[in-house]
Amino acid sequence: MTPGRLLAVSDLHVSHPRNRRWVADLPPGSPGDWLLVAGDLAEKVEDIEWTLRTLRSCYGTVVWVPGNHDLWAHPRDPVKLRGEARYQHLVALCRDLGVITP
């Protein structure tokens, strides 16, 4: 295993253009890097997926714990899932992307 770093972020809120650019401009890390993401990526599933995919491409291991903004069903989100169904959808998305989540 490549030695790496343990990094942590939260509240990325990528629906804000400045925050989205910050995530898009992250430099690649090493395969041994772990990133802990403590919630509030976005309010729409497509933005959550983009963020997790982008972070996963930069870090060897990504661990994500959803926050209230991630789990809240925004009225303009085309994915109209609420509650447990939304959570399970996000868990399945993480599994597909290779992101660790509870």
Regions inferred by a protein language model and the residue ranges of each:
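N-terminal active-site segment of His-dependent metallophosphoesterases
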Residues: 1-64, 70-78
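Extended active-site neighborhood of metal-dependent phosphoesterases/phosphodiesterases
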Residues: 63-102
